[in-house]
Amino acid sequence: MIIHPNFDPVAIHLGPLAVRWYGLMYLVGFIAAIVVGRIRLKLPHVAAQGWTAKDIDDMMFYGVLGTVLGGRLGYVLFYKADFYFSHPLDVFKVWEGGMSFHGGFLGVTLAMMLFAWQRKRHWLQVTDFVAPMVPTGLAAGRLGNFINGELWGRVTDPSAPWAMLFPGAMRDDAAWLPKHPELVEKWHLADVFMQYQMLPRHPSQLYEIALEGIVLFFALFLFARKSRPMGAVSALFLIGYGLARFTVEFAREPDDFLGLLALGLSMGQWLSLPMILAGVALMVWAYRRRAANAAA
């Protein structure tokens, strides 16, 4: 078993100012996205659409607003609506954590639609350009989660080479034991807990870095190297992210205040299913539209 390093959440101390790793990872993610965008400017079919470096800078401004506002509102509405309706001022306490990818995705989509309207472009043309830039930010965000030792995975067999002990999960581990006696006996978890006061868990943040970050990045970047029907790159992002998130959720610990929902699926999985379906529908539409235009 591997023990999580339990990093200091503060990366840099600048006098009274503390720069946290999670915030720093957001910055790294946005910078990486800009770099990817500028690399894509060199592709002939991208250059033919008239994209410029200034467009990327402007899109990132909209993207930051969409990510922060959408991510926070998504967390409030999708995950803890009852609490925040009772404590509305706590919505603004972003330093206490609480961001939702699916909310951030909706926020960024709306922001890109606004950008497209201002630049008189079709919004799918904008999202097709942006989509390959997103996975780098997702990977950076999940790395921030791992450094913070949060959003850990479900309890697993201690003999698994990837099993990890998270100090931040001690309280959850103690509460988990009496609820799962069959697994405690099967995996000899009582002995593990007596020795470490922790239980082995999946490092699901690393799984997300691999699938939502690295694999999705290469899939999108390579797919978008050639000219595709408008909407196809956006569709691949929806399908790819939805499938990656849906898969990883089987190893990720559900939110304790929600648990598992209908059919034994988590909130993250239920929010990912519409993304997958929308992606498939958009992909079919994109290629049928190109075929119809070619036949006309």
Curated annotation (Swiss-Prot):
Q: Where does a 1,2-diacyl-sn-glycero-3-phospho-(1'-sn-glycerol) bind?
A: 142
- Cellular-component GO terms for this entry: plasma membrane
The record describes its membrane topology as: Multi-pass membrane protein
GO BP terms: namely: lipoprotein biosynthetic process
Highest taxon of the lineage: Bacteria
Keyword GTP-binding applies: no
Q: Could you say which enzyme class this protein belongs to?
A: transferase
Bilayer-crossing residues are 17-37, 59-79, 97-117, 230-250, 257-277
Q: Where in the cell is it found?
A: Cell inner membrane
Write the record's keywords in alphabetical order, separated by commas: Cell inner membrane, Cell membrane, Membrane, Transferase, Transmembrane, Transmembrane helix
Entry's EC annotation: 2.5.1.145
Q: What does this protein do?
A: Catalyzes the transfer of the diacylglyceryl group from phosphatidylglycerol to the sulfhydryl group of the N-terminal cysteine of a prolipoprotein, the first step in the formation of mature lipoproteins.
What family is reported?
Belongs to the Lgt family.
| Family annotation (PANTHER family) | PHOSPHATIDYLGLYCEROL--PROLIPOPROTEIN DIACYLGLYCERYL TRANSFERASE, PROLIPOPROTEIN DIACYLGLYCERYL TRANSFERASE
- The name this protein goes by in its record: Phosphatidylglycerol--prolipoprotein diacylglyceryl transferase
* Source organism (scientific name): Burkholderia lata (strain ATCC 17760 / DSM 23089 / LMG 22485 / NCIMB 9086 / R18194 / 383)
